[in-house]
Amino acid sequence: MQIHIEPISKSRIDQVDFDHLAFGRSFADHMLVAEYADGAWQKVTIQPYGPLEYQPAMMSLHYGQAIFEGMKGYRSVSGDIQVFRPEENMKRFNKSATRMCMPEVPKEIFLDGLRTLLKLDQAWVPAKEGCSLYIRPFMFATDEYVGVTPSTTYKFIIFNCPVGSYYSKPLRVRVETEFIRAAKGGVGFAKNAGNYGCLLYTSPSPRDTERSRMPSSA
């Protein structure tokens, strides 16, 4: 499948402090965008990273047909870019897609598209020890419709973030005894958006470390 490339007019890389990288706050110049409609994958484009415009009735906002993956690219001693297990990430991504009634993304879009994207944005892969390029493939339903049924159109996107360590200090472990994320027969194995949104209530955040807990009978 042909990939159309629309290069950015001026890179934003000089705006990033690669010596002090936060996780998930800086984004590389380009993103890969593929569209699914009429039962097949259509146009595939690499374009400047930027906003997307959708209608309020877009189905993924209401019914949760949204999945994602995460992997990392590293700069080797020789300067090459190496990605850890991209084929396995693609398999898991498509397993999530099947569970959420979404189309699988073919290898020529997922892997070949990623390879082309990394080649274009290779300057964004950090060389500093402990840093990497976080790669985020994701897909979401785009039909404009209010009703519980699988969408007929989807968007698949890959964007990249130069990152430092995910955690800035050692972890403290808390065992949750009241709330669960997964249940037998459910979607706990899938990397769908709802699996992570439901965790926020049980995860203390800097904004609300003393949040109240809902009664277990609620």
Where are these regions (language model features)?
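Basic polycationic patches enriched in arginine
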Residues: 211-213
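Conserved small/polar residues in nucleotide/adenosyl-binding loops
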Residues: 201-208, 218
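Conserved alpha/beta cores of soluble small-molecule-handling proteins
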Residues: 1-200
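Intrinsically disordered, low-complexity segments enriched in polar/charged small residues
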Residues: 196, 216-218
